[in-house]
């Protein structure tokens, strides 16, 4: 039997279900797979195979996530679902599964609950750009006014966290009803799929973004100059391009006079490739690991930012004791550690292993960063936390 060929023809979009425990996220995931397979063709997945999520390790953090895939006529979706609330928090903070859009599941029987709010806040902090609401269990509510009330509450809650609550799609359905093959609820799943297609714009591909390459190594080649190596994170580097060296020290500009891969000279390097870039007139000691090579003006160095952080539990190899204000660990960005101090939110005296917390970080040296950049928190080379830059302060 020949292997199925992966069709690269359709745009690929990453989504996931978020929301309060027991509001039906996994049931909805199963319903989407089942109904779309029935309507558009494809492979159905049953509830058990989704809920029984395998353990993954991202930066030493144990996260249970299940990944399913489905198709609409226009797109291919990769969808992530997590069994437990802690898994969601870790998943969103580490970026183990980056989302182009989230499906917020709210049970019509309960309305918004504490984790509904927390997931919306996290979505805002970690930069989930679009949210679509699926109001679940609507078959268990026979009062039309109550459904309207819940919808209004959810929209207001989203607006509170700067999502366009009044304008985003809200679909009232029943995941279980759809799984059981009831036509009126199956139609709601198709409506959800159409909302995904129209409301979430096609994500920009890494290769089309502004060039950026974290510098992993620097060496000089007799008679040719300085070469920096690394994996291109985004964009394209062409021979002759002007580039900026950003982070740690003052930003300097130079020109890339050569690109090589596996000792072969190329005209350009593209996102995802490991390359060496030859820099004109740059001395070996002017560049170091931890800086980035980038399109001039596309990224700036910063030292102070607000972040959302998950602190590893003892079982995950994290700290055994809490930390307090005045804690000074290393913050590992892309390829290097930088020492920094922290400020905890008002009223938070200490942070326990296994907690997630909002904190302001002040680094001793600037790092090239954008909002949404992930980092690890380390003590002597051991990872004790993971975080994401939520808002740049200075």
From Swiss-Prot:
Mg(2+) binds at residue 26. GO terms for biological process: translational elongation. Residues 81-84 are annotated as: G3. The keyword Transport does not apply. Residues 60-64 are annotated as: G2. The keyword Nucleotide-binding applies. Residues 136-139 are annotated as: G4. GO terms for molecular function: GTP binding; GTPase activity; guanosine tetraphosphate binding; translation elongation factor activity. Its EC number is 3.6.5.3. GO terms for cellular component: cytoplasm. Residues 174-176 are annotated as: G5. GTP binds at residues 19-26, 81-85, 136-139. CDD domains: EF_Tu, EFTU_II, EFTU_III. It is found in: Cytoplasm. Residues 10-204 form the tr-type G domain. It is an enzyme of class 3 (hydrolase). Keywords: Cytoplasm, Elongation factor, GTP-binding, Hydrolase, Magnesium, Metal-binding, Nucleotide-binding, Protein biosynthesis. InterPro entries: EF-Tu_GTP-bd, EF-Tu_GTPase, EFTu-like_2, EFTU_2, G_TR_CS, P-loop_NTPase, Small_GTP-bd, T_Tr_GTP-bd_dom. It holds the Pfam family GTP_EFTU. GTP hydrolase that promotes the GTP-dependent binding of aminoacyl-tRNA to the A-site of ribosomes during protein biosynthesis. This is Elongation factor Tu-B. It comes from Vibrio cholerae serotype O1 (strain ATCC 39315 / El Tor Inaba N16961). The lineage of its organism: Bacteria, Pseudomonadati, Pseudomonadota, Gammaproteobacteria, Vibrionales.
């Amino acid at each position: 039997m020949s292997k199925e060929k992966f069709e690269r023809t359709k745009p690929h979009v990453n989504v996931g279900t978020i929301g309060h425990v027991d509001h039906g996220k996994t049931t909805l995931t199963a319903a989407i797979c089942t109904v779309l397979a029935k309507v558009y063709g494809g492979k159905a997945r049953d509830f058990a195979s989704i809920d029984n999520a395998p353990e993954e390790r991202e930066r030493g953090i144990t996260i249970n996530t299940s990944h399913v895939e489905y198709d609409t006529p226009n797109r291919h979706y990769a969808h992530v679902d997590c069994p437990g609330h802690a898994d969601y928090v870790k998943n969103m903070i580490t970026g183990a599964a980056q989302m182009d859009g989230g499906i917020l599941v709210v049970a019509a029987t309960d309305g918004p609950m504490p984790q509904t709010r927390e997931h919306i806040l996290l979505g805002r902090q970690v930069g989930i750009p679009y949210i679509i609401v699926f109001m679940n269990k609507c078959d268990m509510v026979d009062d039309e006014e109550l459904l309207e009330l819940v919808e209004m509450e959810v929209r207001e809650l989203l607006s509170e966290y700067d999502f366009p609550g009044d304008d985003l799609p809200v679909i009232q359905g029943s995941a279980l009803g759809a799984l059981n093959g009831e036509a009126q609820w199956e139609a709601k799943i198709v409506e959800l799929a159409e909302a995904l297609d129209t409301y979430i714009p096609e994500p920009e591909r890494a290769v089309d973004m502004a060039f950026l390459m974290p510098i992993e190594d620097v060496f000089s080649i007799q008679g040719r100059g300085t070469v920096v190596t690394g994996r291109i994170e985004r964009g394209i580097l062409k021979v002759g391009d002007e580039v900026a060296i950003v982070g740690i020290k003052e930003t300097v500009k130079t020109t890339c006079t050569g690109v090589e891969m596996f000792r072969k000279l190329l005209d350009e390097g593209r996102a995802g490739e490991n390359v060496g870039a030859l820099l004109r007139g740059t001395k070996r000691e002017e560049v170091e690991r931890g800086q980035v090579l980038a399109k001039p003006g596309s990224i700036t160095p910063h030292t102070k930012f607000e972040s959302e952080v998950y602190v590893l539990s003892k079982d995950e190899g994290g700290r055994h004791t809490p930390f307090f204000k005045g804690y000074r660990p290393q913050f590992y960005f892309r390829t290097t550690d930088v020492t920094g101090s922290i400020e905890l939110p008002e009223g938070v005296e200490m942070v326990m292993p296994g907690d997630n917390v909002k904190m302001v970080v002040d680094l001793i040296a600037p790092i090239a960063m954008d909002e949404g950049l992930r980092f690890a928190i380390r003590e002597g080379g051991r990872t004790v936390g993971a975080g994401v830059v939520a808002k740049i302060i200075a």
